[in-house]
């Protein structure tokens, strides 16, 4: 009986395993079609994400414009809640669709955090970020092409620091918001959780999308919610207004800092990777 209990305990302790750290530079990866397929998936997913979300923002502003003519003028629009749902819902859908191909990053900050945690190589991270930025630019470009009459009039969906808030407040909002997102990504994709909940594959995209939704509710009044440098860059490039570029650095620095903190917190506090490394070093002496 005791042996059965020990065997069961040993089996439970080995029901999952952490994948080995990704190499910093993997030249062989460049010869694999799977890498380029993943890059294409990131490009298309980010394009769709920006198209739907920015179109929602423009549509809402048009519907609530008192000077607008026609039946839309009397419509209350989707509101901030609807905009937040558009962003969170699209992330849920796109992560679910692309997770098996590229991991479903759709955000340079997420890619950066996973790179710091050695989940992806430097080569893959750089290609992902380039694809995400290009996809975002193309996605916002489609919005401008389809809604040219309203695009410039309603701000192009660009992130801007709202009046009454300091640069420090905007930066802090982006850091905290991105921390929430990337921390959720790490937790939802943790190998131990995957082993236990593998029969419910929707569980990972759901909290990630919901995190995006909640962060938008909190930070739309402050920065319009960036937490995704590609999203901010795409809107700024297509809108190309001085105000959109004035504080654009906030939407890169903030998310990257937030992602780095989330990666460190998950890897070296929650998963105690630092302790594991220390133990390995002591045994090797």
Swiss-Prot record:
The keyword Coiled coil does not apply. Signal peptide: none annotated. GO terms for biological process: protein heterotetramerization; protein homotetramerization. It comes from the Eukaryota. GO terms for cellular component: membrane; plasma membrane; protein-containing complex. Its main location: membrane. Water channel required to facilitate the transport of water across cell membrane. Its function is impaired by Hg(2+). May play a role in water uptake from the root surface. Active as homomers. Increased activity when heteromerization with PIP1-2. This is Aquaporin PIP2-5. The lineage of its organism: Eukaryota, Viridiplantae, Streptophyta, Embryophyta, Tracheophyta. The gene is PIP2-5.
